[in-house]
């Protein structure tokens, strides 16, 4: 059975989800039948076709009134600000991928279900009272049929959690700190402009900008045992895509650099194949653009101090990798069945 999907919010993640669907070979399993986005159809089609980070979309894109043609596929377009106006029941929607960045509460998920959707997947952490938070590759096996309102966590959580998981299983993590070196985002101004966060008043292309992050809380949501054992900070840098994460952990077992890198290499070709990758090439951020993995560890940057303090550099395409995980989690949700 093909899963009938609607995308609510067709910004950076929404568009990348659709592009990833067409590039990943999952179209026999997932069909996007509707998109809800306030922008007009011409703008939707243009930004789907032409992308400053990911280049031109290979499929033909046409607009016929409020039908978006992607190759031979016709996708209904809606422009509603209120979930209550969306015809999910009429369209037989199995899963809504809410990529708006606006909605994320249980009430928001219930609103989609009230309109006829069977399940909802949010593209950000959402509130703590959702049915489940999934980091694909780590805990998707915990999904149950009754989990109707689910979060796909965040791009940085998807990046770091698999690495934490493998290191904890192998070496026993005691505590850790995380520094996210994140590409600029569209909540930052091109030139200085007002914002309640005074650092975010500053031009995105001119500075390295510290911002708040809830990544430590995201780690705890997946691994409750690490409550008060991880801290995180984040800075935005003047690039438009790809993020690096500096992960430092203290571990119980004595280790060296070779131990750490062997673990990651083995995991990348085994339990975390397709989720984690490993490289020792002299690469820079742009080389990871359009990489579908959740995390790519640069083994040349692994450090160990005093046998118990590990530092690793982990890359991710914060758009493309996460968009691919949205598709994976959609399939995992559908595999549990629909009520």
Swiss-Prot record:
Annotated source species: Proteus mirabilis (strain HI4320)
Enzyme class: oxidoreductase
Compartment list: Cytoplasm
Family note: Belongs to the glyceraldehyde-3-phosphate dehydrogenase family. Epd subfamily.
Entries under Pfam families matching the protein: Gp_dh_C, Gp_dh_N
Metabolic or biological pathway: Cofactor biosynthesis; pyridoxine 5'-phosphate biosynthesis; pyridoxine 5'-phosphate from D-erythrose 4-phosphate: step 1/5
Record site: Activates thiol group during catalysis: 182
Catalytic activity: D-erythrose 4-phosphate + NAD(+) + H2O = 4-phospho-D-erythronate + NADH + 2 H(+)
Binding site for substrate: 154-156, 200, 213-214, 236
Name of the protein in question: D-erythrose-4-phosphate dehydrogenase
Cysteines joined through disulfide linkages: none
Subunit description: Homotetramer.
SMART domains linked to this entry: Gp_dh_N (SM00846)
Residues involved in NAD(+) binding: 12-13, 318
The entry's keywords: Cytoplasm, NAD, Oxidoreductase, Pyridoxine biosynthesis
GO molecular function per UniProt: erythrose-4-phosphate dehydrogenase activity; NAD binding
One GO term describing the cellular component: cytoplasm
Protein function: Catalyzes the NAD-dependent conversion of D-erythrose 4-phosphate to 4-phosphoerythronate.
Principal location: cytoplasm
Active site: 155 (nucleophile)
GO BP term, example: pyridoxine biosynthetic process
Domain of life (superkingdom): Bacteria
């Amino acid at each position: 059975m093909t899963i009938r999907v609607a995308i609510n919010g067709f910004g950076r993640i929404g568009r990348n989800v659709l592009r990833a669907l067409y590039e990943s070979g999952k179209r026999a399993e997932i069909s996007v039948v509707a998109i809800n986005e306030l922008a007009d159809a011409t703008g939707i089609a243009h930004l789907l076709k032409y992308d400053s980070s990911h280049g031109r979309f290979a499929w033909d894109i046409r607009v016929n009134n409020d039908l978006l043609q992607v190759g031979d596929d016709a996708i209904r377009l809606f422009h509603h600000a209120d979930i209550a106006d969306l015809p999910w029941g009429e369209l037989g929607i199995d899963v809504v991928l809410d990529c708006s960045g606006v909605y994320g509460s249980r009430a928001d998920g219930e609103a989609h279900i009230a309109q006829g959707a069977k399940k909802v997947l949010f593209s950000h952490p959402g509130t703590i009272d959702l049915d489940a938070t999934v980091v694909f590759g780590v805990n998707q096996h915990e999904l149950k049929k009754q989990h109707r309102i689910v979060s796909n966590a965040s791009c940085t959580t998807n990046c770091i959690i698999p690495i934490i998981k493998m290191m904890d299983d192998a070496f026993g993590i005691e505590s850790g700190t995380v520094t996210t070196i994140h590409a600029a985002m569209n909540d930052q101004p091109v030139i200085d402009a007002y914002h309640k966060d005074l650092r975010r008043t500053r031009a995105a292309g001119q500075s390295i900008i510290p911002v708040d992050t809830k990544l430590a809380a995201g780690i705890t949501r997946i691994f409750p045992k690490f409550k008060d054992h991880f801290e995180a900070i984040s800075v935005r840098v003047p690039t438009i895509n790809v993020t690096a994460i500096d992960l430092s952990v203290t571990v119980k077992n004595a280790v060296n650099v070779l131990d750490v890198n062997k673990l990651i290499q083995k995991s990348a070709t085994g339990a975390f194949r397709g989720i984690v990758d490993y490289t020792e090439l002299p690469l820079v951020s742009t080389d990871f653009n359009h990489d579908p993995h959740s995390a790519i560890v640069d083994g040349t940057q692994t450090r160990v101090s005093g046998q118990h303090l590990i530092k690793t550099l982990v890359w991710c395409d914060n758009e493309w990798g996460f968009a691919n995980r949205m598709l994976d989690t959609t399939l995992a949700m559908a595999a549990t069945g629909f009520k």
